[in-house]
A protein has these predicted regions:
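Conserved beta-strand-loop-alpha-helix junction that forms the acyl-donor binding cleft
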Residues: 1-5, 131-142, 158-163
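Acyl-donor-binding surface of acyltransferase catalytic domains
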Residues: 1-33, 156-161
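A structural microfeature
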Residues: 17-18, 84-85, 113, 154
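Short amphipathic alpha-helix that is part of the acyltransferase structural core
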Residues: 19, 29-58
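Hydrophobic adenine-recognition pocket in adenosine-nucleotide-binding enzymes
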Residues: 39, 101-103, 134
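A conserved beta-strand-loop-helix scaffold within acyl/acetyltransferase catalytic domains
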Residues: 59-102
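Conserved acetyl-CoA-binding loop-helix of GNAT-fold acetyltransferases
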Residues: 103, 109-122, 142-147
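Short, high-confidence coil segments that cap the C-terminus of an alpha-helix
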Residues: 127-129
């Protein structure tokens, strides 16, 4: 650990964020909501702009082209044909990772974030392991995930910058 800290100091790295992993620790009975749908290829430009509003460009690691390839793993909520909430996930052989979720304020439906999360669970019933990373200071997100049945494990993802 001391060697790691020395390397960071010598190379002028500063810790900018610490994300902690959370895993779903309960059986779920997901429900689908009629106002949530899968993203379409023609949504990709709008999705890219939508997520860039909410996430630092250093953290939102999808290019517009990458996002187009992720379309089958993106869920959206639209009002007046505009994307107002979305969730991106990744499937692996034994787990599902929630990559990003963002929800506009003042929506017609008040439970859109919960509905997106439930749709994500329902779309991935073949896989029982659900994981995500959350910024350790984002108490609103942490509380939301805890209410959904997620809990912290011991894995941290630290972000550093030297510029």
């Amino acid at each position: 650990h001391a060697l790691h800290d020395e390397f960071l100091k010598l190379n002028h790295f500063k810790k900018i964020l610490n994300h902690k992993q959370m895993v779903l620790n309960k059986e779920i009975k997901p429900s689908k909501f009629c106002f949530i749908s899968k993203a379409l290829h023609e949504d990709s430009k709008e999705l890219y702009s939508f997520f860039r509003k909410y996430f630092d460009p250093y953290l939102f690691y999808f290019s517009q082209k990458n996002l187009e390839e992720k379309i089958p793993n993106i869920l959206v909520y639209k009002e007046n044909q505009k994307i107002r909430a979305a969730l991106i996930y990744t499937q692996t052989l034994n787990a599902n990772f929630l990559d990003f979720i963002a929800v506009d304020r003042n929506l017609k439906h008040k439970n859109v974030a919960f509905a997106l999360l439930n749709h994500y669970f329902a779309a991935n019933t073949q896989n029982k392991f659900f994981k995500l990373f959350v910024e350790e200071k984002n108490q609103k997100a942490i509380n939301f995930y805890k209410r959904a049945g997620f809990c912290f494990n011991h894995i941290n993802l630290k972000f550093y910058r030297n510029f």
